Curated annotation (Swiss-Prot):
Source taxonomy: Bacteria, Bacillati, Bacillota, Bacilli, Bacillales
Compartments where located: Cytoplasm
Similarity field: Belongs to the ClpX chaperone family. HslU subfamily.
Organism this protein belongs to: Bacillus subtilis (strain 168)
One CC-aspect GO term: HslUV protease complex
Regulation: ATPase activity is much induced upon complex formation with ClpQ.
SUPFAM superfamilies: P-loop containing nucleoside triphosphate hydrolases
One GO biological process term: proteolysis involved in protein catabolic process
Record protein name field: ATP-dependent protease ATPase subunit ClpY
């Protein structure tokens, strides 16, 4: 049974569990996601005409641009990749070519589909793995290779019946032992026994060696050509039955799934639901004022990205991928440049513009306590492992938020990431002393926050280096 797609309101509610504020950005991505579902219900003729409305997010670092896109991808189960515009160079220069973003998207899609298919056959794979473990625990009798007397086959020589009977009896005994062992295995009595398993040796691929050189596609093609000629190396590893089950289940699951089918589905899902998040797009915009050779290079990257965003066909090892219906979300702080500094053709490909707000003191308070993975909850869980119950008074939380806000105002504004630095500084001594502390409950008060952070926060020079 297929999951019912989320409505825009439900998507925003889910995002609220992890990201504070930024309602305009959440609405924009929620509508973009829902439009994909709406498009899937159209007839084929009209479906091809409806293209996704790409989104341009503008706002300082640390306000939730990347997190919104990442959470959206998780909610929809869509292939998602985050790339940085500054990593690319225009065609003809050393560096990554822009088509590699589409190849990366397809690789992500393949991993997603493979994982889904492996989950579908997990039960059968685990059953096969358990059978292999039983055979490892009770090995069979080694077969005699070759014929002792080469003339036996010509003169009717064969093993005496007595030997045949003994061999049959031995096989029956082994089978009986295996049945008993399988029963014990099912009861979980053999989990800590050791077995020796043959596993494939992981070796660096040609693709890994050429990563970042702009020659990834050549590396993948060479790897595919050579993999059929060279057998995969195996090595013997001693491990517990518990570990062996995981390794063998993965091996058995891989045998049960059709990788050609996975590749085809992956290409289709990348084309229909893929999301590419292009970060730091403002860094390839032309800066206002006099032009320079750097501006020419930046413009070259923009012109290379343009056909991918417009819709083109990129050849990957799984087949040709059309980017016409891939959703592109671009983001940048736009401190030095403006969206209008991008080339007009690229601007036109991002019709939805969303400005994310700077974080206020109240936002910082909410970030500390509201999300499911809130920072304070993380620190409380970490210290709970040492037997310490850590509490924060409301006034202390407000004080931490104020310090974060003012340090951002006085130095560089790094958004919510400032809280990581401040909390590390605040709880540094406590984390160090935690194993030796006898108190079961510790409450952080505003006085403690002032003592640890007050002087540093007020001194601009110190703030720049420490917080």
């Amino acid at each position: 049974m297929e999951k019912k797609p989320l409505t825009p309101r439900q998507i925003v509610d889910r995002l609220d569990q992890y990201i504070v504020g930024q309602q305009n950005a959440k609405k924009a991505v929620a509508v973009a996601l829902r439009n994909r579902y709406r498009r899937s219900l159209l007839d084929e003729k009209l479906k091809d005409e409806v293209v996704p409305k790409n989104i341009l997010m503008m706002g300082p670092t640390g306000v939730g641009k990347t997190e919104i896109a990442r959470r959206i991808a998780k909610l929809s189960g869509a292939p998602f990749i985050k790339i940085e515009a500054t990593k690319f160079t225009e065609v003809g220069y050393v560096g990554r070519d822009v088509e590699s973003m589409v190849r990366d998207l397809v690789e992500t899609s393949v991993r997603l589909i493979k994982e889904e298919k492996m989950n579908e056959v997990k039960e059968q794979a685990e059953e096969n793995a358990n059978k292999r473990i039983v055979r490892l625990l009770v090995p069979g009798k080694k077969k005699q290779s070759g014929v002792k007397n080469p003339f036996e086959m010509f003169f009717g020589g064969s093993q005496p019946n007595g030997e045949d009977e003994a061999e049959s009896q031995e096989e029956a005994n082994i089978e009986e032992k295996r049945k008993r062992m399988a029963h014990q295995l099912a009861l979980g009595e053999l989990e800590d026994y050791y077995v020796t398993v043959e596993v494939e040796e992981q070796q660096p691929s040609m693709f890994d060696m050429l990563q970042g050189s702009g020659m990834e596609q050549m590396g993948m093609n060479m790897q595919d050509a050579l993999s059929g000629l060279m057998p995969k190396k195996k090595k013997r590893r001693k491990m517990t039955v518990r570990e062996a089950r995981k390794v063998l289940t993965n091996e058995e699951a891989s045998k049960l799934i059709d990788m050609d089918e996975v590749g085809q589905e992956a290409v289709q899902r990348a084309e229909e639901s893929g999301i590419i998040f292009i970060d730091e797009i403002d860094k390839i915009a032309k800066n206002g004022g006099a032009s320079s050779s750097a501006d020419v290079s930046r413009e070259g990257v923009q012109r290379d990205i343009l056909p991918i965003v417009e819709g083109s066909t990129v050849v990957t090892k799984y087949g040709s991928v059309k980017t016409d219906h891939v959703l592109f979300i671009a983001a940048g702080a736009f401190h030095m440049a403006k969206p209008s500094d991008l080339i007009p053709e690229l601007q036109g490909r991002f019709p939805i513009r969303v400005e994310l707000n700077k974080l206020t003191v109240d936002d910082f308070v909410r970030i500390l306590v509201e999300p499911d993975n809130a920072l304070l909850k993380q620190y409380q869980a970490l210290l709970q492992t040492e037997g310490i119950s850590l509490e924060f008074s409301d006034e202390a939380i407000h004080k931490i938020a104020e310090v974060a806000y003012h340090v951002n105002q006085d130095t560089d504004n790094i958004g919510a990431r400032r809280l990581h630095t401040i909390l590390e500084r605040l709880l540094e001594d406590l984390s160090f002393e935690a194993p030796d502390v006898t108190m079961e409950k510790i409450t952080i008060t505003p006085q403690y926050v002032e003592e640890k952070l007050g002087t540093i926060a007020k001194n601009k020079d110190l703030s720049q280096f420490i917080l």
